[in-house]
Swiss-Prot record:
Amino acids binding ATP: 118-125
Domain ClpX-type ZB: 1-54
Name recorded for this polypeptide: ATP-dependent Clp protease ATP-binding subunit ClpX
UniProt keyword Metal-binding present: yes
Keyword Mitochondrion: no
Gene Ontology biological process terms from the UniProt entry: cell division; proteolysis involved in protein catabolic process
Organism: Lawsonia intracellularis (strain PHE/MN1-00)
Binding residues annotated for Zn(2+), in chain numbering: 13, 16, 35, 38
Cited HAMAP family: ClpX
Function recorded in the entry: ATP-dependent specificity component of the Clp protease. It directs the protease to specific substrates. Can perform chaperone functions in the absence of ClpP.
PROSITE patterns named among the record's database cross-references: CLPX_ZB
MF terms in GO: ATP binding; ATP hydrolysis activity; ATP-dependent protein folding chaperone; protein dimerization activity; unfolded protein binding; zinc ion binding
SUPFAM superfamilies assigned: Glucocorticoid receptor-like (DNA-binding domain) (SSF57716), P-loop containing nucleoside triphosphate hydrolases (SSF52540)
Length: 417
């Protein structure tokens, strides 16, 4: 060793022992050094451990559906399709680095979902419950309020603002969230051909939504759109945001039926009667072209590869909605009554009567709360002032004729006057 080397000894990596001249870069710390090769090795270990953690946390499609079953009644096929789509989406998100390094030629596309079905059948609840199960931020938007930039209404970027706010302004967390856009059928274009005049709340909105649904670097105003023009914009990557869009699509069943019947033509074709098929049976057979004919532009339909439908809920389904989910309406009211030390009980006939009223109003599961509120109002008004009541029984007479419930007291049973 030369005298000069003794004065300036070569620095060594504290991990692998290589000298500073044997490596590309040596980073100094407090009394230690680490080379670029060891940094790369440490990074690989961290990524591998993170993937193992993610693999443990990532729910299987079966587990996702089981969790959905706790909150959503019926819609078995829709829950199964959503579970697979969501599982694949987050597998794509969490394993992005592994996929790009091991399968560089394979690019996994987003599994955005379209839910078709009548109002009150559980579309919004499905999307909201998925976000709750996966513990990711969630935002709901109403497509009818959206317009192209520069027109009166909400810009499509405002949807991303809401997601960011719901993620407590954590950009990384927000960029892995779920956005549900309701009433998507209401922004269908008004004619089959391309729009000549400006359609700012129809085809124009579809065009504006295309990029953020597909995945883009969007500039979003953190305080919302036009009221704060001087604010700095935040760049959000939407590539890993799952978009679920839903709508009633009234009249889509006719388009599907026309296509199916149109296929049975010519010699040897089976001639069937004009018996109408059930709505659910028709919506099971929706093709992308049917949606285009309805008024969604082909590019928009192409960005949403997963199509599924939800059925109208039967009276039996609505009775189950009232009692089975973790946050069932009857359980909520029972909890309220418990706070007054009163047990609330609904007879099976009462539950059927409530479900029947919701069906009559054609509001589906959404109408159950309205029916319950109107029934329970007077009871909840009087009960806190009543002394000695330990149980309140609601039967079908209360539902159908606005009769009084049966109040059971500590010492005797009587009907409240």
């Amino acid at each position: 060793m030369s005298r000069n080397d003794e004065k300036n000894p070569q620095l060594l990596c504290s991990f692998c022992g290589k000298g500073e001249y044997e490596v590309k870069q040596l980073i100094a710390g407090d009394g230690v050094h680490i080379c670029d090769a060891c940094i790369a090795s440490c990074n690989e270990i961290l990524v591998r451990q993170e993937l193992e953690t993610v693999e443990e946390q990532l729910l299987t499609p079966q587990e996702i559906k089981e969790r959905l079953d706790e909150y959503v009644i019926g819609q078995e096929e829709a829950k199964k399709i959503l579970a697979v789509a969501v599982h694949n989406h987050y597998k794509r998100v969490f394993y992005a680095e592994k996929i790009s390094s091991e399968h560089g030629d394979v690019e996994l596309e987003k599994s955005n979902v379209l839910l078709v079905g009548p109002s009150g059948s559980g579309k919004t609840l499905l999307a909201k419950t998925l976000a709750k199960i996966l513990r990711v931020p969630f935002a709901i938007a109403d497509a009818t309020t959206l317009t192209e930039a520069g027109y009166v209404g909400e810009d499509v970027e405002n949807i991303l603002v809401q997601l960011l706010q719901n993620a407590d302004y954590d950009l990384d967390t927000a960029s892995k969230g779920i956005i549900y856009i309701d009433e998507i059928d209401k922004i269908s274009r008004r004619s089959d051909g391309p729009s000549i005049t400006r359609d700012v709340s129809g085809e124009g909105v579809q065009q504006a939504l295309l990029k953020i649904i597909e995945g883009t670097e969007a500039n979003i105003p953190p305080k919302g759109g036009r009221k704060h023009p001087q604010q700095e914009f935040i760049r959000m990557n939407t590539s890993n945001i799952l978009f679920i869009v839903g709508g009633a699509f009234i009249g889509l069943d006719k388009i599907v039926e026309q296509r199916i019947r149109g296929g049975s033509m010519g010699f040897g074709a089976k001639v069937s009667g004009k018996k109408e098929r059930p709505l659910g049976q028709l919506l099971e057979q929706v093709h992308p072209n049917d949606l285009v004919q309805f008024g969604l532009i082909p590019e928009f339909v192409g960005r949403i590869p997963v199509l599924t439908h939800v059925d109208d809920l039967s009276e039996e389904d609505l009775v189950r909605v009232l009692v089975e989910p973790k946050n069932a309406l009857t359980r909520q009211y029972q909890k309220l009554f418990e706070l007054d030390n009163v047990t609330l009980r609904f007879t099976s006939d009462a539950l059927k009567a409530i479900a029947h009223k919701a069906i009559e109003r054609k509001t589906g599961a959404r109408g159950l709360r309205n029916v319950m509120e109107s029934i329970m109002l007077d009871i909840m008004y009087k009960l806190p002032s009543m002394v000695g009541v330990k149980e309140c029984v609601i039967n079908d007479v209360v539902i159908n004729t606005n009769g009084e419930p049966l109040y059971i007291y500590d010492s005797e049973v009587q009907v409240a006057l």
